[in-house]
Amino acid sequence: MNFNHHFTWSLVIISQIFQVQAGFGDPREALLEIQQKHGKPCDCAGGYVSSPPTNSLTTVSCSTYTAYSVTNSLKWQCVSTPTTASPTHIGSCPSQCNSQSYDSVHATCYNHYQQCTIGNKTYLTATMIRDKSPSSGDGNVPTILGNNQNLIIAGCPENKKGQVVCWNSQPSVHMSDGGGPQDKVREIIVNKKFEELHKSLFPELSYHPLALPEARGKEKIDAHTFDLLATVHSLLNVSSQRQLAEDCWLCLRSGDPVPLALPYDNTSCSNSTFFFNCSNCSCLITPPFLVQPFNFTHSVCLYADYQNNSFDIDVGLAGFTNCSSYINISKPSSPLCAPNSSVFVCGNNKAYTYLPTNWTGSCVLATLLPDIDIIPGSEPVPIPAIDHFLGRPKRAIQFIPLVIGLGITTAVSTGTAGLGVSLTQYTKLSHQLISDVQAISSTIQDLQDQVDSLAEVVLQNRRGLDLLTAEQGGICLALQEKCCFYANKSGIVRDKIKNLQDDLEKRRKQLIDNPFWTGFHGLLPYVMPLLGPLLCLLLVLSFGPIIFNKLMTFIKHQIESIQAKPIQVHYHRLEQEDHGGSYLNLT
């Protein structure tokens, strides 16, 4: 009895020590695998399509194209935004513009559009290619314009497919055309108002010294970029995927940066007093910049009512998430400042660090992460330092998004701070990224205010990065429109590519010094890829007829031996039985 008692308690203790996952494995690992497969919105893992999918969960604006999360595969498919047929020419509007025009038309309703004028008013005109119903807000939640005017996303004119229609060039308040020309006009208007606001709060000096770009060596990197990469690498060192930090490549996307926006994990921001009595809020005014909303499902949304069309700053509606609850910030007495390390993400997924008193629209609070991908060191990467003598097919490189490498996606999805590092530890990286955006925008603005000849330099350095590719002897390795930096246990290795290039250069010199390799006046490297197929063809032509004749002879002998073989009939004598006596009886 005593033995059974101890045995029972031993089983209880062991069951508490070892964690058992029921089912087919850890669901967090499955979620991580799914998110890695689907990728980020602007990566377009589902490819580029000509028309938007019929069923999609959410949409994300990516500047020149729109990403759709397809229902059946959950991969992001991208559709290019329509372009103007003639950007410099404004013609006359069709006659039907006099009788009928629309407030807004969705960008997926046409492929190209054109500006036109009639009666001193500018319209947009295009030929409709599809039908689409407008989408409205729910009647049981607060809306910006009230329940009677809660239109959010414009649609296509009804029964106008194949016909030319006209609509206003100026955007309507709180109505989006899906990343079309009206949304672009709204962004320009908002940017100008923020520039005016910034100049009024921080007056410029009357004299600016000439700002010339700093000449950097081939092995130098922009300070902001290096600090950002170093911070990311330090986070990898303390995350659940710390083995990646020992040997990996950190890849930045070339072009304008589009950071990832994650839901702000703070339950204290569920009421308006959190924003107006915020002790860690700094009113840092930055121009609105594009972000990629990631893992937004049900969020606490901020909204401000429409007040006056001539003075309000319409930041649009956050259509990439479902608002589970709303916080009314209408007619605030003071500007709204985002807490440190966070931003307001509003319509067309534009991020703001500061919202003035006359803003209107709806936004959500988010934390930023840089759009950085990781390549494990075990993954072979091409080093474009020398010409390859033998043709090799290019293989796809498997990039791991930073948000997955740090284990943030599973922590956000499960509502925990688990998988290695708490979400609060990423605030430093988000704050650094926001400050970097501010520094880049300030530098660009200073350069734009100077000599016109620097305009091209400004555009080339829009990112604030000095990205020199491997062909130029720099520290950046260009892979699939990304710039990759090598890192190990000690941090970012500045001379990794240079060492690889030196090794490859030594091998090339060894090949050049080999007389066999330099034979035929240097034509041998180009003949070598053909030697394999030529040798195979020569072997076939040489031994093919012999093998064929041997095979035919063998088959012929087999047939002849079968034909010459006599047919044997197997039989045996029948035994006679003796019944009774003899048939002849001699007397």
UniProtKB/Swiss-Prot annotation:
Locus of motif YXXL motif: 571-574
Description of post-translational modifications: Specific enzymatic cleavages in vivo yield mature proteins. Envelope glycoproteins are synthesized as an inactive precursor that is N-glycosylated and processed likely by host cell furin or by a furin-like protease in the Golgi to yield the mature SU and TM proteins. The cleavage site between SU and TM requires the minimal sequence [KR]-X-[KR]-R. The R-peptide is released from the C-terminus of the cytoplasmic tail of the TM protein upon particle formation as a result of proteolytic cleavage by the viral protease. Cleavage of this peptide is required for TM to become fusogenic. The CXXC motif is highly conserved across a broad range of retroviral envelope proteins. It is thought to participate in the formation of a labile disulfide bond possibly with the CX6CC motif present in the transmembrane protein. Isomerization of the intersubunit disulfide bond to an SU intrachain disulfide bond is thought to occur upon receptor recognition in order to allow membrane fusion.
SUPFAM superfamilies in UniProt: Virus ectodomain
Signal peptide boundaries: 1-22
A cellular component term, taken from the record's GO annotations: viral envelope
Transmembrane segments: 528-548
CDD domains: HTLV-1-like_HR1-HR2 (cd09851)
Motif (CX6CC): 476-484
Name of this chain's protein: Envelope glycoprotein
Source organism of the structure: Simian retrovirus SRV-1
